Curated annotation (Swiss-Prot):
Protein name: Flagellar transcriptional regulator FlhC
Keywords: Activator, Bacterial flagellum biogenesis, Cytoplasm, DNA-binding, Metal-binding, Plasmid, Transcription, Transcription regulation, Zinc
Domain of life where this protein originates: Bacteria
Binding site for Zn(2+): 137, 140, 157, 160
Length: 219
C-alpha cells in the first residue's frame, strides 16, 4: 500500500471538515474518505464540539417519494447531476457543492431545508444502485425522483400537483396558533384607540361647544 503524501492527507482532512460542517454522519465519512476512524472522530469533536451521534442511517427509498421530500430531493439531485456530468466535478465535490447550493436556495426562498446531508448522500447511493430514477413531469417537463419501475408517461410531479394536505404541517398549525393571540391584541389595541379618541372629542366638545362644527365649516 503506497503512503499518501502530505498534500493528499491535507486534502482528505479538508474534505472531512467540509462534510462534518454540513452535518455528515460518521458512516458517510468512513465511506467517502480514507482517514482512520480515530482521526475522523477527533475532527468531528473539534468541528462540532461533541462526539459523533450513533445509530442507523436512513435506509428507506420511500421517504424520497413523499410529496415535500420529493420536491427537495429532486432539486438537490438535479443540481448534483449537473455538477457531476456537466461541470465535471468529482462525486464528493458534487455532493458538497450541490448540497451547499440546495441550502442557499432554501435560505433565499425562506424555506426550511427538508433534506440533510446524510439523506442527500443516501439518495445518491440509491441512484447508483438503480433503486431510484428521474421521471419527467408531463406538465413542467422537470425531472423528479421516482422508483425505478414506476410509470414514465403522463406522470405529474408533486410541485405541479401537490396533495390536498400540502402546507398543513404541524409547524404551520403552530404558527397559526401563535399568531391568533397577537391578532386579538391588535384588535383590542385598535378598540382602545377608538375609545380614547371618542372620549377626547367628547371632552373637547364639553369644554368648547361648537369648535368642531366651526372647524368643519371653515374647511
Amino acid at each position: 500500500m503506497s503512503k499518501k503524501s502530505l498534500s493528499e492527507d491535507a486534502q482528505e482532512v479538508f474534505r472531512a471538515i467540509a462534510l462534518i460542517e454540513l452535518g455528515a454522519r460518521m458512516q458517510v465519512l468512513e465511506s467517502e474518505l480514507t482517514l482512520s476512524r480515530e482521526r475522523m472522530i477527533r475532527l468531528y469533536r473539534e468541528v462540532k464540539g461533541v462526539s459523533p451521534p450513533k445509530g442507523m442511517l436512513p435506509f428507506s427509498a420511500d421517504w424520497y417519494t413523499t410529496w415535500l421530500a420529493n420536491i427537495h430531493a429532486s432539486l438537490f439531485y438535479n443540481t448534483y447531476r449537473f455538477l457531476r456530468d456537466e461541470a465535471r466535478c468529482s462525486h464528493l465535490d458534487a455532493l458538497t457543492k450541490g448540497y451547499r447550493l440546495y441550502l442557499e436556495h432554501c435560505r433565499h426562498n425562506q424555506t426550511e431545508p427538508v433534506l440533510d446531508l446524510t439523506r442527500a448522500w443516501t439518495l445518491v447511493r440509491f441512484f447508483d444502485a438503480n433503486i431510484l430514477q428521474l421521471t419527467p413531469c408531463c406538465r413542467c417537463s422537470g425531472k423528479f425522483i421516482g422508483h425505478k419501475h414506476d410509470l414514465q408517461h403522463n406522470v405529474v410531479c408533486d410541485a405541479c400537483q401537490p396533495p390536498s394536505r400540502a402546507g398543513k404541517t404541524k409547524k404551520a398549525a403552530a404558527a397559526k396558533r401563535d399568531a391568533q393571540p397577537q391578532l386579538v391584541e391588535v384588535q383590542h389595541a385598535a378598540n382602545d384607540v377608538e375609545t380614547i379618541a371618542v372620549e377626547s372629542l367628547a371632552a373637547v366638545e364639553t369644554v368648547a361647544p361648537g369648535v368642531f362644527e366651526e372647524a368643519v365649516l371653515a374647511a
